Regions:
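Short, charged N-terminal beta->alpha structural module
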Residues: 49-73
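N-terminal export leaders
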Residues: 14-20
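Extracellular ligand-binding/catalytic regions of CAZymes and related secreted enzymes
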Residues: 46, 123, 229-263
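A short, well-structured beta->alpha microelement
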Residues: 75-91
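Catalytic beta-strand/loop cores that center a nucleophilic Ser/Cys/Thr
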Residues: 168-233
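C-terminal region of N-terminal signal peptides and the immediate post-cleavage residues
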Residues: 33-45
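A glycine-rich, often tryptophan-bearing local segment used as a flexible ligand/cofactor-contacting loop or short
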Residues: 106-178
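N-terminal secretory signal peptides
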Residues: 1-14, 25-32
Length: 263
C-alpha cells in the first residue's frame, strides 16, 4: 500500500561565474527531474490498503506492510480502519488493487461490527477485479458467519480439530507442505479451509493432515488469497515467543502468496 531544454552555446568565453551558475542550474534541474521521476514512480506502484483497526495486534499490520513494500511490485501501503484516519469505503477501495485483512485479535464479532457496513462494497470490488488477502484472523473473515463470504467453501478453526497437531491456541511453529515442499511456518489458532467441489482454487499449502492451509481462489474477476498460518511473520515474532524456524526467516512464502493473490 506502495512524478531542460538544451541551451544554445554562447560563443564568448564563459567566465568562472557563469560556469558556477550554469552548473548550479544544471544540478538543480537534475535534482528536480529526479524528484519528479520518483513521485511519478511512486504513483505508478499499485496501492494496497491494510486494515489496522484497534482489534488487531500491534505488529500484524506493519509486518505485512513491510512485506508488501518489499515485494517485486513494490506496493504503496495505506492503513485503513478505525483509528487510522482513513475509513474503509468504496471510494478508498476504488483506488486500490489489493486489500489486506491481517491477523491479530480474537474478537471476531467486534471486528465484524466495524467491517459489516462495507461488506457489500468490498465483495463488489473483488467481483470487479480487486484482490483480497486474509491472514489468519483475516482468513476467517474471508469466510462466513461472520465474514465477507468470499470463499468457495469456508474457514474453520484447525487447532484442536480432528487430525490437527496443535491442540489449542498456543503460538507455535508447524510444518506445512507448500507447493510440494515441507516448510515451517508460524502458527497461532489459524483456520483451515473447506473447498466446494469444482471450485476454481489453487491450494498453495496444506497442513500435516492434508487440510488446505493456504489457498487462492477466483471470485468473479478478482482473487482471494487466504492463509491460516503466518508466512509473513519475521524473526521478531518467533523471538518474542521463544520460538525459532529451522528453515530461516525468508519472506519467500509470503511473497509467493502475495504474487498469486495480487496478480
Amino acid at each position: 500500500m506502495t512524478s531542460d531544454t538544451p541551451r544554445t552555446p554562447h560563443r564568448s568565453r564563459p567566465t568562472r561565474r557563469t560556469l558556477l551558475l550554469g552548473g548550479g542550474f544544471a544540478a538543480t534541474g537534475l535534482l528536480a527531474l529526479g524528484a519528479g521521476l520518483a513521485v511519478a514512480g511512486a504513483k505508478e506502484r499499485p496501492l494496497a490498503l491494510v486494515y489496522d483497526g484497534p482489534q488487531g495486534c500491534d505488529d500484524c499490520a506493519p509486518t505485512i506492510a513491510t512485506v508488501l513494500k518489499d515485494s517485486p511490485r513494490g506496493y504503496r501501503v495505506e492503513y485503513v480502519g478505525p483509528g487510522t484516519g482513513t475509513a474503509l469505503t468504496a471510494a478508498a477501495l476504488a483506488r486500490a488493487e489489493l486489500y489486506v485483512q491481517p491477523g491479530g485479535g480474537s474478537d471476531l464479532d467486534g471486528v465484524w461490527s466495524d467491517l459489516e457496513p462495507i461488506a457489500d462494497d468490498l465483495r463488489e470490488w473483488v467481483q470487479n477485479g480487486g484482490s483480497y488477502l486474509g491472514l489468519c484472523f483475516g482468513a476467517y473473515l474471508a469466510g462466513s458467519e461472520p465474514g465477507f463470504d468470499l470463499l468457495p467453501g469456508d474457514a474453520f478453526g484447525w487447532a484442536g480439530s480432528e487430525g490437527s497437531t496443535v491442540p489449542d491456541d498456543r503460538d507455535t511453529v508447524i510444518p506445512v507442505t507448500w507447493r510440494g515442499d515441507t516448510r515451517h511456518v508460524y502458527f497461532q489458532d489459524g483456520p483451515g479451509f473447506t473447498i466446494d467441489d469444482s471450485a476454481d482454487v489453487d491450494v498453495l499449502a496444506t497442513y500435516s493432515d492434508g487440510t488446505p492451509a493456504v489457498l487462492v481462489a477466483a471470485y468473479g474477476k478478482g482473487r482471494v488469497g487466504v492463509a491460516g498460518p503466518h508466512p509473513e511473520a519475521d524473526r521478531s515474532w518467533y523471538t518474542e515467543k521463544g520460538l525459532s524456524n529451522s528453515d530461516g526467516y525468508s519472506m519467500d512464502l509470503a511473497q509467493d502468496l502475495i504474487a498469486a493473490t495480487g496478480r
